């Protein structure tokens, strides 16, 4: 079997030793993988594989003799510790073929027969030791048909296979959303630039993407004549991708025939189609800027996910991450989730969700255990975990059904375990089974009569040995004689050297130690043969029974998947309820009106990082007299502009996940997409400058945003000359107002943009407030109407630790520039400050100026300064 589509010319290995001939023959079938070749208690790697493994795993590279006249480079890892090395290789994007000894060394002529029994790739992980407990491993295939990109992806550990079709322009957004661990492409397809940021994609032969071949593969797996029932009959590119994906998975799971694939991949029961209108769309930049699961620095906390993820099960944690990256637009489903959260909070406040969460902690990862049962790779502890989970479910069900939380009663039917399944596991397994079946101790006593008989023979061993020891002591007169056992030498009689003259003639020496001799006698040898045979037979019988048990459990895959889904969703909703209860979140209201009305909104993550958070309102659309469409936000750096913008997006995101939101109230109209253009950095891998990245993101917004989109734009036009940047910012804002007509929050330091409010009544100027007290700036973090008068740029620089000398010099330069600006009237600027010793430009008499001359700012408190600011604003309005 090989997953590579390249034809391989069979090389001549006759000059090599028989063992190396065997190795090279197997290796030629898996040239694109590291071959873990089992030799005794080690997995060995040879030649180039050894060099690569030594480098990646930091293990020793050695030589073992020679073959065909060349030294054999080799490196190895212990069999019992292989998982930790495999996990490291998989994280580095490597694929591994596991080659085991399947022959009996005692009867083999020449090298022991070996065979690849398992292939591990980054996207097809199912072993608990290789998977991230709260993360997913996804393999994705990409096909192109008539300019349409078809995507198919599979979470093998969950049995979840999905497809969609999209445009090439949207590929980056989809990959950012799905974050695949492994990407597969046709050999003939040119590599899209976006894939440069992912682990090197693997190439598959073009024939695997053939449409007819794909249809044949998929209909056989799902037992249907066509794919109409899945709603994807028209998605030709997606079907091509799905067919190639299934072929790849079939081969990696070592199911060589279609029949065995259908049997072993039995947990792949359906093909789900994702359509653009299903989810609230977010492009790659938006997902990064909102810090949903990773901060901008690439850390896991503090993020929205880290705040909300108090899930009791790993299934719940994975589902939460999925919901956060796949916010729904289906309001019926969202209302069901919101009602469930409301009932969980309202039913005996705090008691119900806490009680459910406490019991959920005893539920194992049923989702992944079910997949391993289907793949026949489930280990004994998987099955005991499933057994314990099924026996714990009735208590959770009772807690739900006896509560007043009607909205969560819908989970009960799917969560009720099949009593036949539970009884089978209880009857078949030891209370605490052994870790691996090859060592026994897994199947319970009383489950199989033949196994019980073989075990009884072994248990009587101890009694026989005690009797033999007593008898031999009496016969030989040696009081310290011992009858013992070890794995190397089997059963033996041990006698210290001082009693050497008492050794009977029928004692046969087996081993000499420093202070003792070990012997055997015919009676002990007969018993040893009988006992060891019984042990081998018991292990073989136990292995057979375990395989039969897995076959029986495979019949329960569908109900187990339903249980897993219900438990995971209940877990997430309980987490939502706890967070909402603790942090004072409120239930959002969805409306059909084109409006966004949030009172006392807060940033869910930031408010938990600081002592006091200032809440702010936002009204856009039909709830306002002007039909507000755009807020032009001005004000100082560090004043809270970006936080205000992000909190608006996060509140909408949470609502579309079915969570309560950090606000006094929230009314949300139809939203189809969220776009952000916040911050930027060089894209060195893609060869793009900061400004190019910024403009690319802006272009995506202008092309795709609709009247139902939320657009966040922060500091557009930086990275180029002042006038170029201003012109672009002005044109982009105007386009958003007149063409896209999206809900827009537009933060800027270009004061000229505030003139848009004079031209368009749907554009409103707002600013973040700050006051200066005793030469220091105080950020009030409150959003108020009107444009800002100052940016306090030099104050922020001082707060950042810029030396005083530099700040003073900057003040003088700024004062000079401003004086020149009065005569030349170039671009206005928000970056205004007054240097104490700088000579001010002459000004004509004005009541506001007269009033300002009477004020002494250093004597005012921040509150008094704010009051004076409002008074001056009022005076200016009256004079107009």
Curated annotation (Swiss-Prot):
InterPro entries, sorted: DNA_mismatch_repair_MutS (IPR005748), DNA_mismatch_repair_MutS-lik_N (IPR007695), DNA_mismatch_repair_MutS/MSH (IPR017261), DNA_mismatch_repair_MutS_C (IPR000432), DNA_mismatch_repair_MutS_clamp (IPR007861), DNA_mismatch_repair_MutS_core (IPR007696), DNA_mismatch_repair_MutS_N (IPR016151), DNA_mismatch_repair_MutS_sf (IPR036187)
GO molecular function, one term: ATP binding
Cellular component GO terms held in the UniProt record: cytosol
Domain of life: Bacteria
Alphabetized PROSITE patterns for the sequence: DNA_MISMATCH_REPAIR_2 (PS00486)
Keywords of the record: ATP-binding, DNA damage, DNA repair, DNA-binding, Nucleotide-binding
Any one of the GO BP annotations: mismatch repair
Pfam families: MutS_I, MutS_II, MutS_III, MutS_IV, MutS_V
Positions with a binding annotation for ATP: 635-642
Keyword field contains ATP-binding: yes
ATP-binding listed as a keyword: yes
Family matches, as NCBIfam families: mutS1, PRK05399.1
Function, in words: This protein is involved in the repair of mismatches in DNA. It is possible that it carries out the mismatch recognition step. This protein has a weak ATPase activity.
Family according to the record: Belongs to the DNA mismatch repair MutS family.
Identification of the protein by name: DNA mismatch repair protein MutS
UniProt source species: Nitrosomonas eutropha (strain DSM 101675 / C91 / Nm57)
Gene for this chain: mutS
């Amino acid at each position: 079997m090989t997953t590579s589509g390249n034809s391989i010319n069979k090389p001549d290995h006759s000059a090599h030793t028989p063992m190396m001939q065997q190795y090279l023959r197997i290796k030629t079938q898996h040239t694109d993988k590291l071959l873990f070749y089992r030799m005794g208690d080690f997995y060995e790697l040879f030649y180039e594989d050894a060099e690569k493994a030594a480098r990646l795993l930091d293990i020793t590279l050695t030589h073992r003799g020679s073959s065909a006249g060349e030294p054999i480079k080799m490196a190895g890892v212990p069999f019992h510790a292989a998982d930790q090395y495999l996990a490291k290789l998989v994280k580095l994007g490597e694929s591994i073929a596991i080659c085991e000894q399947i022959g009996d060394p005692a009867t083999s002529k020449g090298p022991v027969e070996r065979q690849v029994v398992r292939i591990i790739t980054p996207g097809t992980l199912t072993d608990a030791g290789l998977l991230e407990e709260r993360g997913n491993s996804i393999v994705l295939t990409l096909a192109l048909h008539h300019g349409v990109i078809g995507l198919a992806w599979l979470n093998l550990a969950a049995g979840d296979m999905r497809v969609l079709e999209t445009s090439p322009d949207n590929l980056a957004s989809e990959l950012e959303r799905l974050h695949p661990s492994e990407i597969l492409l046709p050999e003939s397809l040119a590599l899209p630039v976006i894939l440069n940021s992912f682990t090197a994609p693997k190439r598959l032969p073009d024939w695997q993407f053939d449409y007819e071949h794909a249809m044949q593969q998929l209909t056989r797996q799902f037992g249907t004549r066509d794919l109409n029932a899945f709603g994807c009959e028209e998605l030709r590119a997606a079907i091509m991708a799905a067919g190639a994906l299934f072929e790849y998975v079939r081969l990696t799971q070592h199911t060589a025939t279609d029949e065995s694939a259908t049997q072993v991949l039995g947990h792949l029961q359906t093909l789900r189609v994702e359509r653009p209108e299903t989810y609230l769309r977010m492009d790659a930049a938006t997902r990064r800027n909102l810090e949903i699961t990773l901060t901008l620095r690439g850390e896991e906390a503090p993020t929205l996910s880290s705040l909300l993820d108090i899930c009791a099960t790993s299934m719940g944690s994975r589902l939460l991450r999925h919901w956060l990256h796949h916010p729904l637009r289906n309001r019926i489903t969202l209302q069901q989730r919101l009602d469930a959260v409301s009932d969980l909070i309202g039913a005996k406040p705090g008691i119900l969700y806490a009680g459910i969460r406490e019991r959920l902690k005893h539920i194992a990862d049923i989702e992944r255990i079910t997949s391993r049962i289907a793949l026949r790779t489930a280990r004994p502890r998987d099955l005991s975990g499933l057994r314990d989970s099924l026996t714990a479910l009735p208590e959770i069900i009772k807690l739900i059904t006896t509560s007043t939380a009607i909205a969560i009663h819908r989970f009960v039917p799917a969560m009720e375990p099949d009593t036949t399944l539970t009884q089978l596991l209880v009857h078949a397994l030891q209370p605490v089974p052994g870790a691996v079946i090859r060592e026994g101790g897994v199947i319970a006593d009383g489950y199989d009569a033949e196994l019980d008989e073989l075990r009884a023979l072994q248990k009587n061993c101890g009694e026989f040995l005690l009797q033999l020891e007593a008898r031999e002591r009496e016969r030989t007169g040696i009081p310290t004689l011992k009858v013992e056992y070890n794995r190397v030498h089997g059963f033996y009689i041990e006698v210290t050297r001082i009693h050497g003259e008492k050794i009977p003639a029928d004692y046969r020496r087996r081993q000499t130690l420093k202070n003792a001799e070990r012997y055997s006698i015919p009676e002990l040898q007969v018993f040893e043969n009988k006992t060891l045979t019984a042990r081998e037979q018991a292990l073989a019988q136990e292995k057979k029974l375990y395989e039969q048990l897995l076959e029986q459990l495979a019949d329960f895959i569908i109900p187990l998947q339903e249980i897993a889904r219900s438990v995971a969703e209940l877990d997430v909703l309980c987490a939502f309820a706890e967070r909402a209860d603790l942090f004072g979140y409120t239930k959002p209201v969805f409306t059909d009106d084109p409006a966004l009305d949030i009172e006392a909104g807060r940033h869910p993550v930031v408010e938990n990082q600081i002592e006091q958070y200032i809440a702010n309102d936002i009204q856009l659309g039909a709830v306002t007299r002007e039909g507000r469409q755009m807020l032009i936000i001005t004000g100082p750096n560090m004043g809270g502009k970006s936080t205000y913008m992000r909190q608006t997006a996060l509140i909408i995101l949470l609502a579309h996940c079915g969570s309560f939101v950090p606000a006094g109230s929230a009314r949300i109209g139809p939203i189809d997409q969220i776009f952000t253009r916040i911050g930027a950095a060089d894209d060195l891998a893609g060869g793009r400058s900061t400004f190019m990245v910024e403009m690319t993101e802006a272009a995506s917004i202008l092309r795709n945003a609709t009247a139902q989109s939320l657009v966040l734009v922060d500091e557009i036009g930086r990275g180029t000359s002042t006038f170029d940047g201003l012109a672009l910012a002005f044109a982009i804002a105007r386009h958003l107002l007149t063409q896209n007509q999206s809900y827009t929050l537009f933060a800027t330091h270009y004061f000229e943009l505030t003139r848009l409010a004079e031209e368009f009544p749907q554009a409103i100027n707002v600013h973040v407030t700050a006051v200066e007290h005793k030469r220091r700036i105080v950020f009030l973090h409150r959003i108020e109407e009107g444009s800002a008068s100052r940016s306090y740029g030099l104050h922020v620089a001082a707060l950042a630790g810029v030396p005083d000398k530099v700040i003073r010099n900057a003040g003088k330069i700024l004062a000079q520039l401003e004086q020149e600006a009065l005569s030349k009237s170039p671009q206005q600027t928000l970056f205004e400050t007054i240097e104490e010793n700088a000579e001010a430009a002459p000004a004509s008499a004005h009541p506001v100026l007269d009033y300002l001359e009477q004020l002494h700012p250093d004597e005012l408190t921040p509150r008094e300064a704010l009051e004076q600011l409002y008074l001056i604003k009022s005076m200016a309005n009256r004079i107009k």
